[in-house]
Curated annotation (Swiss-Prot):
This is Multidrug resistance protein MdtC. HAMAP family: MdtC. It is a multi-pass membrane protein. Part of a tripartite efflux system composed of MdtA, MdtB and MdtC. MdtC forms a heteromultimer with MdtB. Belongs to the resistance-nodulation-cell division (RND) (TC 2.A.6) family. MdtC subfamily. It is found in: Cell inner membrane. InterPro entries: AcrB_DN_DC_subdom, Acrflvin-R, Multidrug-R_MdtC. The chain crosses the membrane at residues 3-23, 333-353, 360-380, 387-407, 431-451, 463-483, 528-548, 853-873, 875-895, 897-917, 953-973, 984-1004. One of its GO terms (cellular component) is plasma membrane. It comes from Shigella boydii serotype 4 (strain Sb227). The keyword Transport applies. Keywords: Cell inner membrane, Cell membrane, Membrane, Transmembrane, Transmembrane helix, Transport. The keyword Chaperone does not apply.
Length: 1025
């Protein structure tokens, strides 16, 4: 009593305390960063290595395996995957959440150094690493286009000037430049002209290399001067290479231009990038795992004017894609929802109290509690994101509950004629323990969430802490500011009602009277109520088992990502045509704003596309509906598939795949894996629960297999090295010399002119100069035949791996898909040598599924323990917890009604309901116990009186929580797919709980009281507390 009196009788101190809390909250709000979700990115490091010309199998065995053995020893590696393709290997290391990315990078560098001696000596450079996840969607894509400059020049500007500068910006993890390659001088040889002149490809290569040499020439000195010697030993342009003499034939000079077409071009012509049907260079920017996306994007945007000044005016630098606008729009929607929730909650209070003066009190308590929470969020290192703001939106109904309970009880004493200050003191004393019990038991619900590990625990921690802090501040405010304002603002008389509100008051009285009559009937038919309660428990179990489940709601971020997968034998020219065709189909869709894509590199039959949709207020369809519409049109394109998926704020794993979910096959027997993967993929493609089924196993690429006749070669004076050098010179885009410029180095690339390599007959035109100087056709000592070869070799850990990716059709959930895959694997009878497991987001979903029931049980057990400690009773907590089954039924039925799967967001709603609905029972039980102790009432009389007496605050608190959550259900716009499942769960649970617990709680209270008396050693004692 003295504690409450201190704040009631010292209003200035109480007001200043509340002002201090508010000011700290405002300061914290201004300093909080903005993000779509809490920081949940796994630390990921990508290691890259190259060996030009090496086959995927060679790269896997000689480069990937030694590196994997060394990298696999690093502490904290949770997953290691690799992909080896023509001439390149990429290894993705995913670390545990608590692993520092910088420390992990040092360990990665040490592991690379340790493996260096085991790597092939012909590698042009050491393996490198980058602190970025290549499977993440770029946070921003910049494009360079020009009507004046070539693609090579644009690529040079992008890679030499723009990318290094952008990489230095805080938060940027990787800048990937695509769409072309660096400028180069390309030498396209005419094999027939070479044969006529008796010049081999090696002769040409040697002549070019010897003609372009950059070495120091020294200096001349006399007694007083020094001269640096400089020569014209370098050739820099195609025009300078063309007249180069490479051979003399019968005394006549054979120049390079006589046997080749020499052009200023690019290093790799098998690269193409486009934006909205126009050739472009792409800069794909990804953030560091721990970086804030909004801050990083803002920093890049601030740097763009400076970057524009470093490139010529004829080059157009544009932002093709930016993830931040939809994130900001989503947060603005949540903030609007929060404001609406506060307004609705205050309206509920006003309708029940029917007094503007009384309504001001909770109207002040709510913002003080919510704003003060921002200070704690800042101190905890949190951000303003969808989940933390949703926590504050839900907290609106919670924080007003405490103020309502205190205010309503004080108002009851005032209406009975008690003086204001005395009523404030007496009313607060009566409900102080009730408010404390409600708040502590509600916070207790979140303790299991705070202890939860992995990605779900990291994701929900900010939500749980934010809500708990808001409840804690609300508890402080309700026991200090609220009674003080009641004591000094309210009058010791029944407040005058406005005429238009009297009807609501009469309706409330009639409702209370009707409830009293129905409660009497219920208390005389307790067995029927018991059956209903048991039925809700059984219905909970059945609904939970049958409801579709997923990991996280499918978001509409306004960005789509597409992966092109074409026939494995497709040429680059045909693949570029497919890219253009797909881009045209997508660009013609009315919901699409921008399309950017590229193809080429080490995997000729693949490409990537990034699609920006129009803002949500300019389109009526969701991202998934747009994908469904485009899927029908894209399926008509022959020879290639484009798999679309909506970019999500959460993506787990480092695998680059063409769909949202992955199922990985592992085997130590590569032959078994290659045998079973097509069978499994074809089976999964027939399942109605899956869509866009595809695989990263590509072992059916076209290959021309040459078999040397070594005896013939020895007789003709030709060795294998000379023959292989011929093929590399002719078809390998061989980099034979380096052109040094002040800002960069460029290559001279030699190959047979593509005009002469359009079919297999090009091999018949190749010849080798033997040791006697004679031209020997390749066909004299080699035979060739087409064969199949892998385009890529994939590992996970140290096992061969193949990942099958899939999306979900409209109306199907991840639980449906995972169950269907498990059944299919069983039906196929896959041998034990091939192991299947879900990967990425699907793997986290499986782990979360296994822990959800345990988490709910842990939350209930924690609440029971806290209530047992507060009430010093084993029985009363059970009475209070009996309210939960009805809430669970309501929540699950509401999800079914709205066709929403049970996700991590819905799980939060269930946890919140555990904390919300028990408040009704706490108010009933508290007053019933008080009536038994001091009113000498029987248990039935006590609980009946408690139910009627607390009917108004129960209705107020429940409706406040319901109206606080209702805007989440009704909200549209950006991010609504995250908010709606939470609102649906809470509203459904509250409605069902309110209908049932007003009757089941009294019955359970009486049941346990009779049970207590039956087993009590002192059966005549009414109350044991």
């Amino acid at each position: 009593m003295k504690f409450f009196a201190l704040f009631i009788y010292r209003p200035v101190a109480t007001i200043l305390l509340s002002v201090a809390i508010t000011l700290c909250g405002i300061l914290g709000f201004r300093m909080l960063p903005v993000a779509p979700l809490p920081q949940v990115d796994f630390p990921v490091i990508m290691v890259s290595a190259s060996l030009p010309g090496a086959s995927p199998e060679t790269m896997a065995s000689s480069v990937a395996t030694p590196l994997e053995r060394s990298l696999g020893r690093i502490a904290g590696v949770s997953e290691m995957t690799s992909s080896s393709s023509l001439g390149s290997t990429r290894i993705i290391l995913q670390f545990d959440f608590d692993r520092d990315i910088n420390g992990a990078a040092r360990d990665v560098q040490a592991a690379i150094n340790a493996a260096q001696s085991l790597l092939p000596s012909g590698m042009p450079s050491r393996p490198t690493y980058r602190k970025a996840n290549p499977s993440d969607a770029p946070i921003m894509i910049l494009t360079l286009t020009s009507d004046t400059y070539s693609q090579g020049k644009l690529y040079d500007f992008a890679s030499t000037q723009l990318a290094p500068t952008i990489s230095q910006i805080d938060g940027v993890g990787d800048v990937d430049v695509g769409g072309s390659s660096l400028p180069a001088v390309r030498v396209g040889l005419n094999p027939q002209a070479l044969f006529n002149q008796g010049v081999s490809l090696d002769d040409v290569r040697t002549a070019i290399s010897n003609a372009n040499v950059r070495k120091p020439q020294g200096a001349l000195e006399d007694g007083t001067h020094r001269w640096q010697i400089q020569t014209n030993d370098e050739l820099k342009t195609a025009a300078e290479y063309q007249p180069l003499i490479i051979h003399y034939n019968n005394g006549g000079a054979v120049r390079l231009g006589d046997v080749a077409t020499v052009t200023d071009s690019v290093q790799d012509v098998r690269n193409a990038g486009m934006t909205n049907a126009k050739p472009a260079i792409l800069l794909m920017i990804r953030k560091l795992p721990e970086a804030n996306i909004i801050q990083t994007v803002d920093s890049i945007r601030a740097k763009l004017p400076e970057l524009q000044e470093t490139i010529p005016a004829a080059i157009d630098l544009q932002i093709a894609q930016d993830r931040s606008p939809t994130i900001r729009a989503s947060l603005e929607e949540v903030e609007q929802t929060l404001i609406i929730s506060v307004a609705l909650v205050i309206l509920v209070v006003f309708l029940f109290l029917r007094s503007g003066r009384a309504t001001i009190i909770p109207a002040v308590a709510v913002p003080v509690s919510l704003i003060g929470t921002f200070a704690a969020m800042y101190l905890c290192g949190f951000s303003l994101n969808n989940l933390s703001l949703m926590a504050l939106t839900i907290a609106t109904g919670f924080v007003v509950d405490d103020a309502i309970v205190v205010l309503e009880n004080i108002a009851r004493h005032l209406e009975a004629g008690m003086k204001p200050l005395q009523a404030a003191l007496q009313g607060t004393r009566e409900v102080g323990f009730t408010v404390l019990s409600m708040s502590l038991s509600l916070v207790a619900v979140f303790l299991p969430l705070l202890l939860m590990g992995g990605l779900p625990g990291r994701l929900l921690r900010e939500f749980a802490v934010t809500l708990s802090v808001a409840i804690g501040i609300s508890l402080l405010v309700s026991l200090t500011l609220t009674p003080m304002m009641c004591g000094w603002m309210l009058k010791a008389s029944k407040p005058r009602e406005q005429k238009r509100l009297r009807g609501f008051g009469r309706m409330l009285v009639a409702l209370q009277q009707g409830y009293g009559k129905s409660l009497k009937w219920v208390l005389n038919h307790t067995r029927l109520v018991g059956v209903v309660l048991l039925g809700t428990i059984a219905l909970n179990i059945w609904l939970y088992i049958s409801i579709p489940k997923t990991f996280f709601p499918e978001q509409d971020t306004g960005v789509l990502m597409g992966g092109i997968q074409a026939d494995q034998s497709i040429s680059f020219q045909a693949m570029r045509g497919k890219l253009q065709d797909f881009m045209k189909i997508i660009r013609d869709d009315p919901a699409v704003d921008n399309v950017t894509g590229f193809t080429g590199g080490s995997r000729v039959n693949s490409g990537m596309m990034f699609i920006t949709l129009k803002p949500r207020d300019e389109r009526s369809e969701t991202a998934q509906q747009i994908i469904d519409r485009l899927r029908v049109k894209l399926a008509k394109e022959p020879g290639a598939n484009l798999f679309l998926m909506a970019v999500q704020d959460i993506r787990v794993g480092g695998r680059q795949s063409n769909a949202s979910y992955q199922y990985t096959l592992l085997s130590d027997d590569l032959a078994a894996l290659r045998e079973w993967e097509p069978k499994i993929r074809k089976k999964l493609a027939t399942l109605p629960e899956l869509a866009d089924v595809n695989s990263d196993q590509q072992d059916n690429g076209a290959e021309m297999n040459l078999v040397y006749d070594r005896d013939t070669m020895a007789r003709l004076g030709i060795d294998v090295q000379a023959a292989n050098s011929l093929l590399n010179n002719a078809f390998g885009q061989r980099q034979i010399s380096t052109i040094y410029q002040p800002m960069n180095q460029y290559k001279v690339v030699m190959e047979v002119d593509p005009r002469y390599t359009q079919d297999i007959s090009a091999l018949e035109k190749m010849f080798v100069i033997n040791n006697e100087g004679k031209a020997i056709p390749l066909s004299y000592f080699a035979k060739w035949q087409p064969a199949n070869a892998p385009l890529s070799v994939n590992h996970q850990g140290l096992s061969a791996a193949s990942t099958i990716s899939f999306n979900l059709p409209t109306g199907k959930s991840l639980s449906d898909a995972s169950a269907a895959i498990d059944r299919a694997m069983t039906q196929l009878g896959v041998p034990s040598t091939v192991r299947g497991s879900f990967a990425g987001t699907a793997q986290v979903f499986q782990e979360t599924m296994n822990s959800q029931v345990i988490l709910i049980i842990a939350a209930i057990a924690t609440v029971y323990i806290v209530l047992g400690i507060l009430y010093e009773s084993y029985v009363h907590p059970l009475t209070i917890l009996s309210t939960l089954p009805s809430a669970g039924v309501g929540a699950l039925l509401a999800l079914e009604l709205f066709n929403a799967p049970f996700s991590l967001i819905a799980l939060i709603g269930i946890m919140l309901l555990i904390g919300i609905v028990k408040k009704n029972a706490i108010m009933m039980v508290d007053f019933a116990l008080e009536a038994q102790r001091h009113g000498n009432l029987t248990p039935q009389e006590a609980i009946f009186q408690a139910c009627l007496l607390r009917f108004r605050p129960i209705m107020m608190t429940t409706l406040a929580a319901l109206f606080g959550a209702l805007p989440l259900v009704l909200s549209g716009g950006d991010g609504s797919e995250l908010r709606q499942p939470l609102g649906i769960t809470i509203v459904g649970g509250l409605v069902m709980s309110q209908l049932l617990t007003l009757y089941t709680t009294p019955v359970v209270y009486l049941f346990f009281d009779r049970l207590r008396l039956r087993f009590s050693r002192k059966p005549k004692q009414t109350v044991t507390e």
